[in-house]
Amino acid sequence: MDNNPKINECIPYNCLSNPEVEVLGGERIETGYTPIDISLSLTQFLLSEFVPGAGFVLGLIDLIWGFVGPSQWDAFLVQIEQLISQRIEEFARNQAISRLEGLSNLYQIYAEAFREWEADPTNPALREEMRIQFNDMNSALTTAIPLFTVQNYQVPLLSVYVQAVNLHLSVLRDVSVFGQRWGLDVATINSRYNDLTRLIGTYTDYAVRWYNTGLERVWGPDSRDWVRYNQFRRELTLTVLDIVSLFPNYDSRTYPIRTVSQLTREIYTNPVLENFDGSFRGSAQRIEQSIRSPHLMDILNSITIYTDAHGGYYYWSGHQIMASPVGFSGPEFTFPLYGTMGNAAPQQRIVAQLGQGVYRTLSSTFYRNPFIIGINNQRLSVLDGTEFAYGSSSNLPSAVYRKSGTVDSLDEIPPQDNNVPPRQGFSHRLSHVSMFRSGFSNSSVSIIRAPMFSWIHRSAEFNNIIPSSQITQIPLTKSTNLGSGTSVVKGPGFTGGDILRRTSPGQISTLRVNITAPLSQRYRVRIRYASTTNLQFHTSIDGRPINQGNFSATMSSGGNLQSGSFRTVGFTTPFNFSNGSSVFTLSAHVFNSGNEVYIDRIEFVPAEVTFEAEYDLERAQEAVNALFTSPNQIGLKTDVTDYHIDQVSNLVECLSDEFCLDEKRELSEKVKHAKRLSDERNLLQDPNFRGINRQPDRGWRGSTDITIQGGDDVFKENYVTLPGTFDECYPTYLYQKIDESKLKAYTRYELRGYIEDSQDLEIYLIRYNAKHETVNVPGTGSLWPLSFESSIGKCGEPNRCAPHLEWNPDLDCSCRDGEKCAHHSHHFSLDIDVGCIDLNEDLGVWVIFKIKTQDGHARLGNLEFLEEKPLVGEALARVKRAEKKWRDKREKLQLETNIVYKEAKESVDALFVNSQYDQLQADTNIAMIHTADKRVHRIQEAYLPELSVIPGVNAGIFEELEGRIFTAYSLYDARNVIKNGDFNNGLSCWNVKGHVDVEEQNNHRSVLVVPEWEAEVSQEVRVCPGRGYILRVTAYKEGYGEGCVTIHEIENNTDELKFSNCVEEEVYPNNTVTCNEYTANQEEYGGAYTSCNRGYDETYGSNYSVPADYASVYEEKAYTDGRRENPCESNRGYGDYTPLPAGYVTKQLEYFPETDKVWIEIGETEGTFIVDSVELFLMEE
């Protein structure tokens, strides 16, 4: 053919040194090294050289990233712009081209570093350089790729997007394969591998989505529209979909050796007619219907062409196709006649199966548009000759139907290798010929006979060959026969061809395979499928059952087929073939009819290859065995945390049931045993947070705002969330006491756990001293990579089998011996030393978690308190010294406490008439109660300074006296018949005339301010006629005039207390005002007093009836005679009561009402009258 002078006309693939320029839509694209040429070369490279290493890296440089410049990148954009009639704005265009150029420059540096490292792989400097170059390349691609997804330009940028993401996947594969040899840690390598597997799906779905969007956009009703539609479909199949279909092969753990793929999709050159793209209106749908529907791949054997004549013009009127199944198994089959069986000339049979098949057609078109329309004068649009050229390394002569022409199929489907003659470097071969026809010779205005040439990629081999040294992927459309009920359906775009579908159990298909390896070679079978149901796959060879396994559903019913819908699964049992030519059968069983099962391909993997499921099993076995101190699993290693055991359990649970069910069960039992051992050595009660505050004397105690949450993608078991607080004196807290009976003498213990995230989390261990750390752990919210979107299972449960970051013991946070905690770590540990054991004293160890800031928060779980090691040497001497200092301090504290307690008890007893503490002395006033309360609060170490809800050494005696103070307040409130007499509730219960205010003065003190002489405040009070009452008022007068508090009945019986600024008054000693909350009436008191402690105690759930546990509160660094102050102690009683300022006067009078109602009125004559409190209570009988 190459010697034929007619063929050697100056067309693009014969004159590459002088390429033609095609003009389409006003744009110029040089043919030769076009986007299609580059993409075809890349596809050939990916199909033949898909092995990681310098060869692959440098191959990408030669094909694209070291070859393509700005003009070629612009051609990628122009190609799609023309097809969809959309121009990319200049800014977006320049940005994309600049970024591609930057990636090209950076990748060339990366490739050179890779080449140098591969030549000297142990050189530390070159390993370091590779780590640097990988990080730079990965970061650049991560940043650049979003720029190729610009809003409104997703379709025009699609082909350069695919080039960029293909480069990204190749770089991620490099680090997955070579990262350890570059010196990267395993956690980083696994993280990047997880990125790789996730992005394969992400990039695939994006490309297919926007391909379909663009394809829909160019559809139209006429032949011109169909030409554009077909061109878009053909060219973007070559530049986008073919490349995308090979993305899964980048998964280096699933495809660790050379993998052979095949593209079975077909593309179509335009109907070979002159003026076809503009002459036939409303014909697009009929033209599309001329293309074969989805089908099994077959081998084109021959074309029998029939010739007709009209008005003396001879043309191709029809043809019949003879074909064979893949593997040439079985007899040939004949397709129905396309067109008409003309007899104007002898039929001509074109043999297609010579050499490597027909790779090129050169057609001659004929078009006649007569001046007179009528019988024998119709418009004629036909093909009057075609040359069929054969692919071959030698120069096979072409087959010619009538004559050759200039319409060259290579113009639409170029070769994949331009460095050799087209007969060797071709990319596609002719797979089928159909026909679009219209009109009859005796009636129609037009006669159209347009052969439609279908082409298949040359990677789709005539046979299903299985060698020994590679993974062989065989699309199931290469089957010989379909099972009854199986159909071929259109592929989703990323499978490289159509797929098979079944909706009921039964045989899927059979295919003939040819084994070129020794028959002793063993293989495993893998299946890439999608299914709406769980099912069982069966395989057999030559009728002999091989494998059977259960597999799970991958998608929901009615869902679209996406990359994530497909799963590649395999059988563990290897097999070998008995014959060099065998029939492989695949069936699907054990599912209900009406579900959908889709099969893309099967894979034959040499049994020696370790793939992902085996890798997972090996990794899980190593992780499980590493938990124990010995192979017989007697004990756990000390550094194995409870959290790590949970993560290993997840690793085991995620193993494939189909691949290693027995091994999975065995490993699961070992992990459960490890978990039980972990629970046994953990001295904490309820470490899994079944409840908080469930039992008063054991387990976890905590503030009411703490929540327990179920396991998620970070924690396998329950964990707690601690929020922030608005007042540091009312912190969020969680605590537990380790009983003395659980501890061993002179031993170090360790508290440890896992923190998902925290801010201002304070952790304490308290015995002789307080060990304390504040831990800030920035959280990602998940162990899953931030960009991972599928960490939720199909039922909403955490998907712990999704790619995640692995536990790394080197990142553990260790806070030993006062060292500062590594706050970036999620793991924490804090230790404490225990001296001698005294069960009567029951010091134990307090474990406390606390947050006292508004922005604070924490999520933590897997808490453990366990024995670490016996104390020896310096550590033993240190704990004995601390213990002695603590005992000395305790003895001194006991002496001081005895003195303070005696004084406080005497003050408290003096308030009451008897030891029953049910009645106040007649002269007991509020100041006396405050004074007694103040003395009670001088008792030290009633509560731990670290957390005021935990009782200290003197909690018992403090709570004894404090309870009596509460009783005194309650009795005092109960005998005051004036409601809201201290104005703590504003003006509630008072009648007001004119303008008055209630102001807060001197911290926690509310006073009534009467600023005007016309203002008046009054209250009606019910009393017992004939009984005596005392009216007591504490007030202050500013300026001239008098302030008056009057008591009277309806008629007469009036008395008053007057206050003046100019008269020397005796100030009531140490008089203060209570901060009680006012209770509506006497009956509601029920003898119970509510002080400012009320809110505090309710918040912390204190129960003073429970015997107090003692715990030391002395820090090792603070063994002094001074007391450690708790800054929040003032909120626990007397601290809320401040003395009255100078000038306040307390006055009282006796009053004997004659009726059951009296009125209390407050007013003034001039200046300002300030009233602190008004009391009216019965005299004692």
UniProtKB/Swiss-Prot annotation:
InterPro entries: Cry1Ac-like_dom-VII, Cry_V, Galactose-bd-like_sf, Pest_crys, Pest_crys_dom-III, Pest_crys_dom_I, Pest_crys_N_sf, Pest_cryst_cen_dom_sf. GO terms for molecular function: signaling receptor binding; toxin activity. One of its GO terms (biological process) is symbiont-mediated killing of host cell. Promotes colloidosmotic lysis by binding to the midgut epithelial cells of many lepidopteran larvae. Belongs to the delta endotoxin family. Toxic segment of the protein is located in the N-terminus. This is Pesticidal crystal protein Cry1Ae.
